[in-house]
Amino acid sequence: MSDKLRQIAFYGKGGIGKSTTSQKHLAALAEMGQKILIVGCDPKADSTRLILHSKAQDTVLSLAAEAGSVEDLELEDVMKVGYRDIRCVESGGPEPGVGCAGRGVITSINFLEENGAYDGANYVSYDVLGDVVCGGFAMPIRKQAQEIYIVMSGEMMAMYAANNISKGVLKYANSGGVRLGGLICNERQTDKELELAEALAGKLGTKLIHFVPRDFIVQHAELRRMTVLEYAPESKQAQEYRTLAEKIHANAGNPAIPTPITMDELEDLLMDFGIMQKEDTSIIGKTAAELAAAGM
């Protein structure tokens, strides 16, 4: 196994299961003997809860506010160690409606770099808020991560988010050297989901890294604030995350510059698979009474 540091980031539509998928994959990497650092880049501070068995880890910003400033903190103040010695940090953010949460990401990453947090790690993983690819939330794309993995499903908005994130990766690909590692499909049991995910990956100039089947054992584990690998290590679902980890581990050097598509092209893809019907423009702007009068 390579000792070279790999910096990866997980993006995806809010609610797609990005944080939990990344934690289970990282738990599997730790089982393989890899030394892991997780940097949570979401104000909800839920990027490490399954690794630490906690509701939410104290964040860099909240601890800095208590101490006076981030300069008053030590690395051990913000870093916790969880399952399989995975090191965990949450950047945090301000109260809703106050300030810029993206600045918390910038502050945290700068603090971690200056205090040697990355020393000895094989992987640093950034778990980033929803599909936001601007401001501080884009820092893992602009300056840190070499590989971006997008968690998606066969639902239209998840695919839209994947395409949007690909545009962000493309923007910084030449200046920052970041690449798209691939798509990870979290099954939602929609029609032709696997085929659709593979087709979207092809359109984006990347590949479907893994199709994660839906299994209720995941919910049972999460209710106990555990990854499936810790809760039910012999289960079929635990093996799915080990397979995902093996594929990402073997993907070093293979990520590519993405080729995002237009909204029209995305809708055409959905229509090709029978997921979406061609829009009837004749009904746009018509009231119920007007449609009834026209026999529509």
UniProtKB/Swiss-Prot annotation:
PROSITE patterns, per the entry: NIFH_FRXC_1, NIFH_FRXC_2, NIFH_FRXC_3
Residues that bind [4Fe-4S] cluster: C100, C134
Annotated catalysed reactions: N2 + 8 reduced [2Fe-2S]-[ferredoxin] + 16 ATP + 16 H2O = H2 + 8 oxidized [2Fe-2S]-[ferredoxin] + 2 NH4(+) + 16 ADP + 16 phosphate + 6 H(+)
SUPFAM superfamilies (UniProt xref): P-loop containing nucleoside triphosphate hydrolases
Mod. after translation: The reversible ADP-ribosylation of Arg-103 inactivates the nitrogenase reductase and regulates nitrogenase activity.
Pfam families, per the entry: Fer4_NifH
Cofactor(s) needed for function: [4Fe-4S] cluster
Disulfide bonds: none
Function: The key enzymatic reactions in nitrogen fixation are catalyzed by the nitrogenase complex, which has 2 components: the iron protein and the molybdenum-iron protein.
Protein name: Nitrogenase iron protein
UniProt lineage: Bacteria, Pseudomonadati, Pseudomonadota, Acidithiobacillia, Acidithiobacillales
Gene this chain is encoded by: nifH
